[in-house]
Amino acid sequence: MAPVEHVVADAGAFLRDAALQDIGKNIYTIREVVTEIRDKATRRRLAVLPYELRFKEPLPEYVRLVTEFSKKTGDYPSLSATDIQVLALTYQLEAEFVGVSHLKQEPQKVKVSSSIQHPETPLHISGFHLPSKPKPPQETEKGHPACEPENLEFSSFMFWRNPLPNIDHELQELLIDRGEDIPSDEEEEENGFEDRRDDSDDDGGGWITPSNIKQIQQELEQCDVPEDVRVGCVTTDFAMQNVLLQMGLHVLAVNGMLIREARSYILRCHGCFKTTSDMSRVFCSHCGNKTLKKVSVTVSDDGTLHMHFSRNPKVLNPRGLRYSLPTPKGGKYAINPHLTEDQRFPQLRLSRKARQKTNVFAPDYVAGVSPFVENDISSRSATLQVRDSSLGAGRRRLNPNASRRKFVKKR
């Protein structure tokens, strides 16, 4: 495995204790990645690295480009500011040493086209026979009348078919003609018990045992790098890997944690089951409720859209919803939860004293007044900590179990 010339490392590479000196020649990262690491063991390893760790900040234009691209792929809500900077640094190094002609500027969009097959009439399902038209019942031949079974233990299965012929007698005659011994029933039971015992003793080669666990870990820690790769990113974040793959950048795997394919995501409402590709929405565009969940989708060759749902029950976790909603309050400074998109809120504006600005060139400026803006601490808006009208309806705390600030700075 030839080492990559330039490698950008994420926090997951340091937490997994990856041998980056064997993966790449020049190791890059940003200072925010090192700041994220809090455990003592990893910090001790960072203090005595066997290679030179280079800190480099990405340019703002690449940060803006990666941010817009991640919004189109649907991974933007899953990425932190540090993750976006790591992606931007990888894009910047690729542009400096390789070029951007082979990189994608737009992700692969999910397009739904008309399908030849009707979705309500599935075809070619394994294990099922779906006739197009009901066939008339066929009459039973007179020459072969159905024989009634002698043993009625399995009568429910024998009603609709003739009993299968027993070929044990014919097999015994063939063995007698060849001169072979016919095993008795007791010998067959003993042989079967021995075979089962041998099968149970065989542990197989695919099991992980204390003797081979170190070898398996060494194989998993190997990083499969394709040839002719000059810039790559080592990360264990699947959202970052998805963005890198869709942009055309190289992802270096650590401990075998690598996504198989790039997926696109949409938002699906679990209330009205409508979907939207606008990943920046908070409320459903059809019913207006806050019931949107991210779902990965793939498109087949015939244009059929397949949505992949998670079996994890935490996806639709009702935590914090067991409490009843508070009674809606009226007035200008009421704090009501934001439940629907078209819910109206009063305009929370600052007081006049807080909105006073000093402009000596204004025609209505009164001389002699203090040129300093007064700090409003007595009005009700200042008491309720209303900072700006863009905040909407103030503190809309939906979950009573959410963490709160215990220590408030006194005025």
Swiss-Prot record:
E.C. designation(s): 3.1.-.-
Residues that bear Phosphoserine: S184, S200, S324, S351
Entry-linked InterPro entries: NOB1, Nob1_euk, NOB1_Zf-like_sf, NOB1_Zn-bd, PIN_dom, Ribonuclease_PIN, WRNPLPNID
Q: Has keyword Phosphoprotein?
A: yes
Q: Which domain of life is it from?
A: Eukaryota
Q: Which residue intervals make up region (Disordered)?
A: 120-148, 181-208
Give me the residues that bind Zn(2+), please: C269, C272, C284, C287
Keyword Zinc present in the record's keywords: the answer is yes
Task: Give a short account of what the protein does.
Answer: May play a role in mRNA degradation. Endonuclease required for processing of 20S pre-rRNA precursor and biogenesis of 40S ribosomal subunits.
Protein family (similarity comment): Belongs to the NOB1 family.
Q: How does it assemble?
A: May interact with UPF2. Component of the small ribosomal subunit, ribosomal RNA processing complex (SSU RRP complex).
* Name of this protein: RNA-binding protein NOB1
* Organism (species): Pongo abelii (Sumatran orangutan)
User: Which lineage is the organism of this entry classified under, starting from the top rank?
Assistant: Eukaryota, Metazoa, Chordata, Craniata, Vertebrata
Q: Identify the coding gene.
A: NOB1
